[in-house]
């Protein structure tokens, strides 16, 4: 009797738990007896993953927080190394969380276990020399975007472009009317979605210039509605405080819902850079991108950066499709004219380009990831 397929897997945050869930489902569709063990969140556990530690153990952000938790993180890593070397899986998958997973993958690879890193770190954008560490730690990288694979190919590092899970999740055509109904927004108004970031540090720097931009837009478009996506109660309160101090006369509808629903309900979007810009492209809404970090972080990022663009739609297109304003340029003097241009344009060509790019990265990423891993360990795949 053949032994069931055994896969080691570690996800470090909620987004990784979602990727892990889809990956496990796709493997089990082909190998129903497959076993999964490592660290997962509630979604992975519901699919049958045996989680040896709570995923929260790995969910630390920022240098100070990481330093405070370092002894515990090192202990978890040592325990996982001991477990997997004593009970070797057919393959180990590290999902995102590169600071933790790449170190774990390197040790496991050195012990003869095949390793895969799922979600490429942004080596194509900054600190490109990390690619040598990735090569030493992995047998294969699974990349969401085609330019990531092109970067790995340049260095002869094994990588497969699997498409993006967001491109699979978001329909080719989104329903603005249904989104407005869902969020309770007036159908007959024009709406601008405002997304000033999901982290406290982002909102602290980006909300004010975004609100001041809305002030200027309101003068030209007095009937325009402004709808803000807040990821949680803390960000809602933070935005409200900045709004009341900056432009109390303006009306904002603040919604604690997914950014995707808020963008779908809007006619145009003013957003902080990040995955949300890709999501905005996929819901086919014209956008202007603004981003700001503290001056020291910005200076360091500028020195280490190797890309011309910050927002994913532009990086993906290899040219400026959407205007982006970074650091000092994240100011109403720049944001307002760009936003006016978007609001006074039919944006048809841009939406056509967004649709073309959506099709390009829509490949059933869960299935592609599963098949790439199965090929690595010489298992049959359902193409």
UniProtKB/Swiss-Prot annotation:
Q: Which cysteines are joined by disulfide bonds?
A: none
Q: PANTHER family annotated for this entry?
A: LIPID-A-DISACCHARIDE SYNTHASE, LIPID-A-DISACCHARIDE SYNTHASE, MITOCHONDRIAL-RELATED
Question: Known InterPro entries for this protein?
Answer: Glyco_trans_19
Lineage: superkingdom: Bacteria
State a single Gene Ontology molecular function. phospholipid binding
User: What is this protein's function per UniProt?
Assistant: Condensation of UDP-2,3-diacylglucosamine and 2,3-diacylglucosamine-1-phosphate to form lipid A disaccharide, a precursor of lipid A, a phosphorylated glycolipid that anchors the lipopolysaccharide to the outer membrane of the cell.
Similarity-based family: Belongs to the LpxB family.
Enzyme Commission identifier(s): 2.4.1.182
Can you cite an annotated GO cellular component?
membrane
* Known catalytic reactions: a lipid X + a UDP-2-N,3-O-bis[(3R)-3-hydroxyacyl]-alpha-D-glucosamine = a lipid A disaccharide + UDP + H(+)
Any one Pfam family here would be LpxB
Q: In which pathway does it act?
A: Bacterial outer membrane biogenesis; LPS lipid A biosynthesis
Its gene is: lpxB
Q: What is this protein called?
A: Lipid-A-disaccharide synthase
Q: Which UniProt keywords apply?
A: Glycosyltransferase, Lipid A biosynthesis, Lipid biosynthesis, Lipid metabolism, Transferase
Q: Which organism is it from?
A: Aliivibrio fischeri (strain ATCC 700601 / ES114)
Class of enzymatic activity (EC top level): transferase
First and last residue of the signal peptide: none
Record has Lipid biosynthesis as a keyword: yes
Cite a single GO BP annotation.
Answer: lipid A biosynthetic process
